[in-house]
Structure formats: C-alpha cells, structure tokens
Design a protein with these regions (language model features):
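A short acidic, Gly/Pro-enriched loop at the edge of an enzyme's catalytic core
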Residues: 92-93
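S-adenosyl-L-methionine
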Residues: 1-31, 41-48
Length: 93
C-alpha cells in the first residue's frame, strides 16, 4: 500500500471519538485486537457483524487511519482504534 499525505489528518484523528480513548469502557468482555489494520475494511465489517464482541484496531500511520475513519458510517460502540506503533503496544495493555 502506498502511503499518501492526507491534509489535516492529525486534526481528523484528534477529533474522532473512536481514536485512542474509551478502551477501558468497551461494552463487551470478549475483545479482538487487529495490529496493522490498514484502511479498516476487515475490522469495521466485523464490528458491524458482531456487536457483542469488542474490536480494537491498531495502525501506525495517520494517513491510513484517516481512511479507516472515513469508512465508519454508523455508530459502533464496540469499535476503538489506536494510532500507535505496535512496538509500544505494551504501554496500552
């Protein structure tokens, strides 16, 4: 995947309710973690399909994370996204 600069990516990420907050408030006990979620197709589809399971997606690159945010077209309380380098994941969990 070729990374492209997205103008205003940091502002979009900082304003989004799904990013880097509320992980400890997820509604379900069962949780799946996807490291390197890319543009989010897989994790968003599964969050819609399985509302009783939590999904946490991790992505390192702002421009890719913005593309995932743009695909969220409904309220998904069981989905959270982390803008994070997977090498530092132990600081979150």
């Amino acid at each position: 995947m070729r990374l492209r600069n997205v103008v205003g990516a940091k502002d979009i990420i900082n304003a989004n309710i799904y990013i880097n907050r509320g992980i400890d408030e997820l509604p379900n006990k069962k949780t799946y973690l996807e490291i390197g979620m890319g543009k989010g197709d897989f994790i968003i589809a599964n969050a819609k399909r399985y509302p009783n399971i939590n999904f946490i997606g991790v992505e390192k690159y702002d421009s890719v994370l913005v593309r995932a945010i743009e695909k969220i077209d409904e309220d998904l309380p069981n989905l959270k996204l982390l803008r994070l380098d997977a090498n530092t994941i132990d600081t979150v969990f």
